[in-house]
Amino acid sequence: MSLIVGPFLSNWSFIKKAGTIILLSTIVVWFTTYFGFTEDGFRMLAEDEIDMSILGKIGQCLAWIFIPQGFGNWQATVASITGLVAKENIVGTMGILYSAGEGSVYANMAATFTVASGYAFLAFNLLCAPCFAAMGAIKREMNNTRWFWIAIGYQCGLAYVVSLCVYQIGTLITTGAFGIGTVVAFLLIIGFIYLLFRPYKESTTLKVDTKKVA
């Protein structure tokens, strides 16, 4: 019976999530993608004006953060942000943003991402902080605001570093390009290897003389 009930409850939970949080956030993404402020005031934008939208302006302000990862464009940046609401949102956001303009979604994405930057984008969003619901669960379990933010910061920092290494090393392999970013990536990888294989040291323990205690 549990083999039937377990999957059913999991699927039902996803259906409720898809029908509420994901649907609502997709509507918000669509609205902020096609509306913005222009010289004519606040209005709905044409396909070739999407970069002037509310979402476009937000993404453009933050896109520079992901330049070392190879996906420093506002569309990918916004998709990563909406992934904090629910990871499934990334698919819907990418579909909306890259369907604007000429060509298909896949053609527009192929023109924006290289193989290395595509894998870097996936690595970042797979390893970064989970959705808001999971963050809430982490905070409840830790029961400490300070350690909660440390955990979230660690996840985002690890995702950023791994994503950078994936892009820089991937670019070196596919194109042969070598730069400062490649050097940084190699140094980070060396640091990871050291942390994995460094000798384990016993922590200092307190020795108690049981005879004196007795």
Task: State what each model feature region is.
Residues 5, 21, 120, 146-154, ...:
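Alpha-helical transmembrane segments of integral membrane proteins
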Residues 11-18, 89, 129, 156-165:
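Hydrophobic transmembrane alpha-helical segments of multi-pass transport and channel proteins
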Residues 27-156:
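Extended, low-charge hydrophobic alpha-helical regions
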Residues 1-6, 51, 98-101, 213:
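Juxtamembrane inter-helical linkers in multi-pass membrane proteins
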Residues 3-34, 76:
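Core transmembrane alpha-helical segments of multi-pass membrane transporters/permeases
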